[in-house]
Amino acid sequence: MRNLFTALKQDTHANHDILENTFPFSIYHKDSLFDEKAYLAILKIMSMFHQASANAVQQAEFEVPALAAVASMINSGVIQDALNRDIIALTRDSLTEDTHATGTYTDQAYKDTHHNKPSMPYSSSPTSQAISAIYVWLGSSMGANIIVRRLNAMERDIPTNYYQAMAGCAKAWVSFKQEVEKLLPELDLENESFVADAVKDANAWFEYLISLADAEMHNNTSQAVEIS
């Protein structure tokens, strides 16, 4: 049987690359000037991802209490609070305009302007969806420290609460893998079928993020056309 994390890394590589090269995430590959609107778009997209994945993890934990140890590693309350503060700070300082950033950035605010919001990701099972969600969540935190340093080096007062909070999540990466490898035999999930399910669900989370990025850019384009 293939190791779960080897399979996840190898079999989600294509979608991971697509996501990194999808605007607005692609701005991190460039050493250009700070793009306020793209940065705000990233924060909004990640807010939607973190809300959806935290809900999936919470539901799975309710059904399988043994997941509690890994579920706590995403630190969802701290992450969402940091996102909300950054989104509000960006708009409050007039770096860019957004009519919804006067309070907590919620799913309802997204629905107000995103009529084609992507549907929730495919799920093979609550456990595989939760573990794959945490895999994508913590995996996305690995470069957070680098992003914070790059943003702080720019001659702008850029809010970085989100990436600072994610840098904290990155510290749980090794513990997460160890805990999952200990947990799977206990749940009788140490088999090829579960590995396949987890890979499928992880790819679904990546595709969800890509869809959120596409929807955000479509929404911004539509608003620009309406204004012009």
What are these regions (language model features)?
Residues 1-228:
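Metal- and O2-centered redox machinery and metal/ROS homeostasis
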